[in-house]
Amino acid sequence: MKISIPTAKEMNTDLPYIEALPLREESQAVLDSLAHYSASELESFYKVSAEKAEEEYAHIQTLKDQSAKHYPALKLFDGLMYRHIKRDKLTEAEQAYLKDHVLITSALYGVVPALSPMAPHRLDFLMKLKVAGKTLKSHWKSAYDEALQDEDLIFSLLSSEFETVFSKEIREKMVTFKFMEDKAGQLKIHSTISKKARGAFLTALIEGQVQTVEQARKLRFAGFDYRPDLSSDLELVFVKQV
């Protein structure tokens, strides 16, 4: 059983760094494509300010010359979902669960264990980067599939941009999750609710050592309860009363 989560744009490098691993072939090809851009070209590629583009240019160059500092991926990313994941003061059992079951999907590193070393970088599958003439999604599809092909049960906490990198065969094995708020009988869903809830849900999976769909259905976390009337076999819906 594996749980897949996406990367985030926000990062925190105020952490002890760890030893890097050699870049896999697919990652090196992506890096080589990024390295073709000048700082001013990155400004329009990333749709960011000149200052931010310079920062990203520096990140790419340090990756290229192998001087980049690396951090455990789960702690490096600091978006809303990540800030709601229990990442510190884990018990031995929780550490082991994280190591055995949680994978991060990245447009630069591929599908990797949650505590794998990663360097700060900015890349997602909505960006129009060509790698050897292919889109990022096409470039990664076979490696993404390979990472999960032997799994019978996959919990996906991915956004659609990451989920659709996988082939239909893999996606059909995924159990997905929807998190909603019930305000005076009106069910609402938006990205802030979803991101916070994904982090809280992953924390509940880790703390509960969840291995099955049946166990996941029984979870209560951050005010959310499972709603069988809104769920299906492959989509579990959790609702919070507000």
For each of these PLM feature ranges, what is it?
Residues 86-233, 237-242:
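Internal, well-folded beta-alpha domain core
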Residues 2-89:
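Active-site helix-to-loop segments that bind/position phosphate- or nucleotide-bearing substrates
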